[in-house]
Amino acid sequence: MKNIRILGFVLILSIGAFGQKESADLIVAHGIVVTMNPERTIYQDGAVAVRGDSIVAVGPRAEIEAKYQASQVVDAHGGLVLPGFINGHTHVPMTLFRGLHDDVTLNDWLYKYIFPAEAKNVNEEFVRWGTRLGAAEQIRSGVTTFVDMYYFEDVVAEETKAAGMRGVLGETFIDFPAPDNKSEAAMLAYTEKFLKKWQGDALIQAAPAPHSIYTCSKKTLQDAAALARKYHAPILIHVAEMKKEWEDSEKQNGMSPVQYLNEIGVLGPDVIAAHCIFVDASDRKLLAEKGTGCVHNPSSNMMIASGVAPVPEERAAGIAVGLGTDGPAGSNNDLDLMEEMDLAAKLAKITKMNPLALGAKDVVAMATIDGARAIHMEKEIGSLEVGKKADLALISLDEPNAVPMYDVYAQIAYSLKGSDVETVIIGGKVVMRDRKLLTLDEPKILEKAREYGKSVKASLGME
């Protein structure tokens, strides 16, 4: 009887203590929490509490569990808990062109192969299934936010939201008939409707995406920028990617691509500039002063031999530099941002002949908090801090390539792979648990991708 009384007393105390806890919808526990906050705090046995789509607490597991109760607990099993990765530049529907005509120059790839292939194959359904395939691949490697430029971008938005991903999605402006719009007037009308539809959405940020200064007239560039600013949207554009682009701009405009964009009123703190390879000291100063974000795409730049972005100098100038995969066709055949971290660091080291040129901690930042700064979303994502969106990637340390671990950042940048990502949470919702995708029908997506591979080959007379 005495034992029963004691047990009852303990139970009452437990219930009382439990009742005093704050509620959370989800707690991620038993992980090494790499916050990427300004202090770069790491909790060796940490936890993250989530309410709704946002983080309400980050800290030692014992403290979080003492203060919060949650309806759902995700066990990190001693692995890493990171901010979700940010793919700052890609063309996701082009997953369905993966491997189509590699090992050619960018100019030949665009004009001889891809533009004709797009004219014959790209429609809403192509974009729909390409986006589903790209979303599956990105989630599997820990990407929670991506910046896209393509056609039928409203379809990309629908599928991105259905997958539970966060997207900054740009409708392409280009000075020749595109698969979805055959004139600038049609492009403007489509894009304005697109911007209106997605304004205020929790996951989707719609944007105009003038392709580049070599495919868009001054008027097209200015019209796209004006539309973006009317709706307080970002502007996505390729900038100074090729030497020929820089040479032509100097010859035709008397100035560099960066200076030209500034001269015509496009450059600004709302611009996300992909590549930024051919940028000298004056260009870098201008980019920093304007608050323009740059996105480094090492795999792409290496694959098409377009050049090496001066990332250490850009960062030293105060430019926010993120990472992107580009591709996923022709310029890079995968969407694994962890691979880009590894390559970015090593590419900087070898080109500068300096092993200190760009370190592991630098490239992890470029994939997270600096990537968020580059796409002007650092107040919402990029680090595990109270008030930010609950976008997390949980990475296993139970594979041969993951042990032993002496330095967390070096392990992430140089040892771990996208395939080591186990669980992904976006906006407080689990979209992949224990490597199983929860928002996408992966077998069906793979089946459709194979079908598209056959139809694309047939359309180009490759069979």
Where are these regions (language model features)?
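Alpha-helical scaffold segments that flank or form the walls of functional sites
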Residues: 98-165, 187-200, 450-455
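His/Asp/Glu-enriched, well-ordered alpha-helical/loop segment
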Residues: 263-270, 312-400, 413-417
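Active-site glycine- and acidic-residue-rich loops that bind
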Residues: 147-150, 207-223, 302-305, 374-376
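Active-site microenvironment of metallo-dependent hydrolases
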Residues: 3-12, 17-46, 50-61, 67, ...
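Active-site gating loops and adjacent loop-to-helix segments of metal-dependent hydrolytic enzymes
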Residues: 96-129, 166-185, 243-270, 290-293, ...
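Metal-coordinating catalytic core of metallo-dependent amide/deamination hydrolases
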Residues: 20, 155-277, 284
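Hydrophobic faces of well-ordered beta-strands that scaffold small-molecule active sites
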Residues: 86-90, 146-147, 167-170, 206-210, ...
